[in-house]
A protein has these predicted regions:
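Short, small/polar residue-rich loop motifs at catalytic or cofactor-binding pockets
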Residues: 118-120
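A short, aromatic/hydrophobic, helix- or strand-capping loop or linear motif
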Residues: 42-48, 115-116
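Glyoxalase I/VOC metalloenzyme domain signal
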Residues: 1-17, 21-42, 54-111, 126-144
Length: 144
């Protein structure tokens, strides 16, 4: 890795919102998030991480068993689970029904079926590691 004087990895903006998820199957999670519209930012020097973007937000997937922890107690807690209890990743989509169909085809749990909530149409599901995801399709100015 190349670091600047500020300690930032070369080529990686310092002021981006980044969300990191520790996952049990890096390839499966990576593929799923790509199909949900995320873009891949290759980082060949970090084999146990996958960097993705969605707009200006970064999602960093790390292998739960290969990526380091900052202390032994956090590692123990992360591996015992449940993963991310209380955490919800919200992903906008242009086609909620197609995203819901993808979730079902993948055999992933849906915890709230699609419903209208006034400002958007939403549904909730769990990703392969049990992280809760809310998908939202915003209403157009005409209300559809």
């Amino acid at each position: 890795m190349r670091y600047s004087r500020a300690g930032i990895i070369a080529g990686m903006p310092a002021r981006q919102l980044k969300v990191g998820l520790r996952v049990s199957d890096l390839d499966r999670s990576f593929d799923l998030y790509l199909r949900l519209g995320f873009r891949h930012l290759p980082q060949a020097e970090q084999a146990h991480l996958r960097y993705l973007t969605f707009g200006h937000t970064w999602l960093i997937l790390s292998d739960v068993d290969q990526h380091g922890y900052h202390n032994a107690e956090r590692e123990r807690q992360a591996k015992l689970g449940p993963p991310g209890l209380g955490f919800v990743l919200v992903i906008p989509t242009a086609d909620l029904e197609a995203t819901h169909a993808l979730w079902r085809r993948e055999g992933l749990p849906v915890t709230l079926e699609p419903e209208d909530v006034g400002w958007a149409r939403i549904f909730y599901g769990l990703d392969p590691d049990g992280y809760e995801i809310m998908f939202e399709q915003f209403r157009t100015p005409s209300g559809t």
